């Protein structure tokens, strides 16, 4: 179904250990954010601002509560909209150093989002994109979009794919 899957704590830990050195004074876009755990973790590890995009009202409420609990509201913007409308709204207004997305598996949504990002003005030049996807997800199209897969971290049932903009 389309329900949100929590990214497990271990996965989250691994993810942030892999990018920890870079989380400085930067901006983080959390797409299909679910509970907001990833974006909130990013803020707590030094990101200047995180933008959360989520369409599900229950998930939005969860993000708001988690931000309140962690007292990180000042560094967060929550957009309740589908990802593509949100990207259009942000395009030209904001640039991101990190984009994390955890789309529903097996709907090819990551490809649609990456295709949009490739022609948008949303990415800083050394931006890192991280996609959480099922192990079967095909990423062979990345190079045509001008992206480079730098790393794949496989877990039991899913993986994190680290993508950069080609120089």
Predicted region positions:
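Class I S-adenosyl-L-methionine-dependent methyltransferase catalytic core
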Residues: 1-167
């Amino acid at each position: 179904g389309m329900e949100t899957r929590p990214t497990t704590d271990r996965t989250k830990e691994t993810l942030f250990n892999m990018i920890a050195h870079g989380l400085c004074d930067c901006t983080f876009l959390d797409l299909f954010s679910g509970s907001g755990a990833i974006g909130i973790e990013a803020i707590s590890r030094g990101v200047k601002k995180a933008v959360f995009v989520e369409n599900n009202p229950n998930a939005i409420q969860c993000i708001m509560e988690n931000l309140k609990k962690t007292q990180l509201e000042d560094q967060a913007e929550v957009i309740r909209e589908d990802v593509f409308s949100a990207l259009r709204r942000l395009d030209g207004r904001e640039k991101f150093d990190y984009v994390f997305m955890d789309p529903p598996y097996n709907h090819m949504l990551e490809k649609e989002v990456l295709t949009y990002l490739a022609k948008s003005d949303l990415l800083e030049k050394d931006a890192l994109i991280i996609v959480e996807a099922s192990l079967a997800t095909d990423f062979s199209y990345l190079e045509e979009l001008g992206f480079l897969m730098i790393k794949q971290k496989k877990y039991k049932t899913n993986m994190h794919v680290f993508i950069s903009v080609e120089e």
